[in-house]
Regions:
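Active-site beta-loop-alpha junctions enriched in small/polar residues
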Residues: 11-15, 45-47, 74-76, 114-116, ...
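Single conserved hydrophobic/aromatic residue that forms the stacking wall/gate
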Residues: 252-260
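Short, electropositive alpha-helical surface patch
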Residues: 58-65, 121-133, 164-170, 231-249
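Aromatic-lined glycan-binding groove of carbohydrate-active enzymes
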Residues: 198-230
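A contiguous pocket-lining binding segment that forms or flanks enzyme active sites
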Residues: 186-198, 202
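Active-site acidic/histidine proton-transfer and metal-coordination neighborhood
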Residues: 80-180, 187
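Hydrophobic faces of well-ordered beta-strands that scaffold small-molecule active sites
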Residues: 6-12, 40-42, 69-71, 109-111, ...
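N-terminal pre-domain/capping segments
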Residues: 1-99
Length: 260
């Protein structure tokens, strides 16, 4: 029998973490459990700075509470860069993230693929696909074959990260799983996700491209995001209600591992 199940958690901590008297990353498991959550996406957006020993201690504290960690890799990953050095560095950032993720007892590494820059979307995607293939090879060679890379859908139109672009990256290897950020997709489509039918179309597209079993285990982000003509402008709080998760909550989500 599969041990997969739907999980809910936060990406990083909010102001409530300090307000409740927590000070250390070692407090994250207790903080998460008190909210009734069972997942936590550790943020390495500004660099992988969490030591492996501390990560292992966090994993030991999280295990009895059935909390599963994932890791968001550095924001400056650019798998589509015109500069080869930046593409190669991106692979190193994924390797660093994989090491921390394993120490945390997790398996999923979420990352932004990069931007199109001064090249066509097609050219940017080809570079990202090549970098992804090399990243998978590097992870395998480094002993991280059990890690799951999760390219994320992005909110700015100039970024690489439409639903189809992310699914193309996932086609590189069966171990790659999409991170579907519904807020980002809504922003880059200028408010194109309004109903449960819109959400269902996204889920159906994933199933079509990945097959039901892979599509059932995708990683999810949800946030309210303000957008302009270029897509994402800024993140909102959940107190701002122009775009919310209600339609997707009524859709039959076929996921077995979720971060909302």
């Amino acid at each position: 029998m599969s041990d997969w199940k739907i999980r809910f958690g936060t990406a990083g901590t909010s102001d409530s973490f300090a307000a409740q008297g927590y000070k250390s990353s070692l407090d994250v498991p207790e903080y998460t459990a008190k909210m009734g959550l069972n997942a936590f996406e550790y943020q390495c957006g500004r660099g992988v700075r969490l030591g492996l020993d501390k990560a292992a201690k966090m994993a030991a504290l999280a295990g009895p509470k059935d909390i599963l960690f994932s890791v968001h890799a550095p924001y400056y990953i650019s798998m589509s860069s015109l500069e080869e050095d930046k593409r190669l560095n991106s692979i190193q950032y994924l390797l660093q993230s994989a090491a921390v993720c394993r120490a945390l007892g997790g398996r999923r590494i979420i990352f932004h693929s990069g931007s199109c820059g001064k090249q066509s979307r097609e050219a940017a995607l080809e570079k990202a696909l090549d970098t992804m293939r090399r990243a998978v090879e590097a992870l395998d060679e480094a002993g991280f074959a059990d890690m799951t890379l999760c390219p994320e859908t992005m909110g700015k139109i100039g970024q690489l990260g439409t639903l189809d672009e992310v699914l193309a990256l996932c086609a590189v290897d069966r171990r790659i799983t999409p991170c579907i950020d519904f807020g980002h997709l809504n922003a880059r489509t200028l408010g194109g996700i309004r109903s449960k039918e819109d959400y269902a179309a996204i889920l159906d597209r994933m199933a079509e491209k990945l097959g039901d079993q892979r599509a059932e285990r995708f990683h999810v982000h949800f946030s309210r995001i303000e957008y302009s003509a270029g897509g994402e402008k800024r993140h909102w709080t959940f107190a701002e209600t122009q775009f919310g998760p209600e339609p997707v909550s009524y859709t039959h989500l076929r996921a077995h591992e979720t971060v909302l």
